[in-house]
């Protein structure tokens, strides 16, 4: 039912709000309970059924973000400290099939295939990952990835390091 799905979304995102509440850079550092997230009120109005306001991203600041990829040689030449280096081990790029052309309109196969391909390129499996930051403006993509790669929503590693897009923020929120 819609209510069961809304409850599942609240259970998925409440732990993310808890992480964001402890993050000094969070745009919305408030821990929210499942009930706060799923209950429609004047302050948590329905944005688009089944998503109340507190379960979707809300831009609060306007800015941009970027990542610069370079070789080790270039990083050394530019004086980038090794403590700031991040090695790209796996990657993938997929194009999603048009919504009405999918066998299941409630799934996003390309995102799951992209995760699987990135893991394959990296030569690792989902169990080799020690930390996740599944980032989306609303719950469906997080569920989609979890379901598609066999990751439990209550995995002890957690699903976010930052607090997730609705609570920590994104490029539009100084991320």
Predicted regions and their residues:
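C-terminal catalytic subdomain
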Residues: 169, 173-175
